């Protein structure tokens, strides 16, 4: 039976590796009674290379660290002004398939941006969300023990230049775009609030409980 309560953790600005290891720990130690959680965070500049990642897609990392991680997909960039959301969900319990979860995540971004009259869309052959063929949100998940971790990154109000140091998600020349330039949410906080609403509605959560920071382990 699905847990109809979603716990939202507002982590503020946190370095990538500590949050990644906390996600792994939560997933590895959770059981059938554990809460579904949505972690909302902003990371300092970092490139993360997914399991399918090829080194040739990192063109010139320069002074930005590159971290090899255990999610799907290729290389992407995280930095200040980008909303990062990690859904830690028991999809086996809720009987949601992996492809269905990806579709729900993409659609929650599309629905949120539609509130700002932004015509965004997903693409069947390239995970993420796009506006006029420019990418506004990236997606990369990992499923372990029937539970999801990792998640999505939405460009809100950030320096997009570091994306030119890589082939984003393995696509050479892929142009990125962000919410602020399109009249969407102007801050990471606003984007997080709005995305939480559309995400919880799409996945059928009826109660939201908000927390500041990570739970004590």
Curated annotation (Swiss-Prot):
Task: Give the active-site positions.
Answer: 169 (acyl-thioester intermediate)
Q: Where does substrate bind?
A: 71-78, 138-140, 151-153
Q: In which pathway does it act?
A: Protein modification; protein lipoylation via endogenous pathway; protein N(6)-(lipoyl)lysine from octanoyl-[acyl-carrier-protein]: step 1/2
One Pfam family, short name: LplA-B_cat
The record's keywords, sorted A to Z, are:
Acyltransferase, Cytoplasm, Transferase
Site, as annotated: Lowers pKa of active site Cys: 135
Q: What is this protein called?
A: Octanoyltransferase
Cell compartments where the protein resides: Cytoplasm
Task: Tell me the HAMAP family matching this sequence.
Answer: LipB
Q: Any one cellular component term from GO for this entry? A: cytoplasm
Q: Which family does this protein fall into?
A: Belongs to the LipB family.
Any idea what job this protein has?
Answer: Catalyzes the transfer of endogenously produced octanoic acid from octanoyl-acyl-carrier-protein onto the lipoyl domains of lipoate-dependent enzymes. Lipoyl-ACP can also act as a substrate although octanoyl-ACP is likely to be the physiological substrate.
Coiled-coil residue spans: none
Matching InterPro entries? aa-tRNA-synth_II/BPL/LPL, BPL_LPL_catalytic, Octanoyltransferase, Octanoyltransferase_CS
The molecular function terms in GO held by this entry are: lipoyl(octanoyl) transferase activity
Q: What else is known?
A: In the reaction, the free carboxyl group of octanoic acid is attached via an amide linkage to the epsilon-amino group of a specific lysine residue of lipoyl domains of lipoate-dependent enzymes.
Q: What is its main location?
A: cytoplasm
């Amino acid at each position: 039976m699905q847990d109809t309560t979603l716990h939202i953790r507002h982590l503020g600005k946190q370095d990538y590796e500590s949050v990644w290891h906390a996600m792994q720990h939560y997933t590895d130690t959770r059981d059938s009674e554990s809460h579904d959680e949505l972690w909302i965070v902003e990371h300092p500049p970092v490139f993360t290379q997914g399991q399918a990642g090829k080194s040739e897609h990192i063109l010139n990392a320069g002074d930005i660290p590159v971290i090899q991680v255990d999610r799907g997909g290729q290389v992407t960039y995280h930095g200040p002004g980008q909303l990062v959301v990690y859904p830690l969900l028991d999809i086996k319990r809720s009987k949601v398939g992996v492809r269905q979860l990806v579709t729900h995540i993409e659609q929650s971004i599309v629905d949120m941006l539609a509130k700002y009259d932004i015509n965004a869309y997903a693409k069947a052959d390239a995970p993420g969300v796009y506006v006029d063929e420019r990418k506004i949100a990236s997606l990369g998940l990992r499923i372990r023990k029937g539970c999801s971790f990792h998640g999505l990154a939405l460009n809100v109000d950030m320096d997009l230049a570091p994306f030119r140091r890589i082939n984003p998600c393995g696509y050479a020349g892929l142009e990125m775009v962000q919410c602020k330039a399109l009249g969407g949410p102007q801050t990471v906080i606003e984007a997080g609030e709005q995305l939480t609403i559309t995400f919880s509605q799409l996945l059928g959560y009826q109660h939201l409980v908000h927390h500041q920071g990570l739970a004590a382990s």
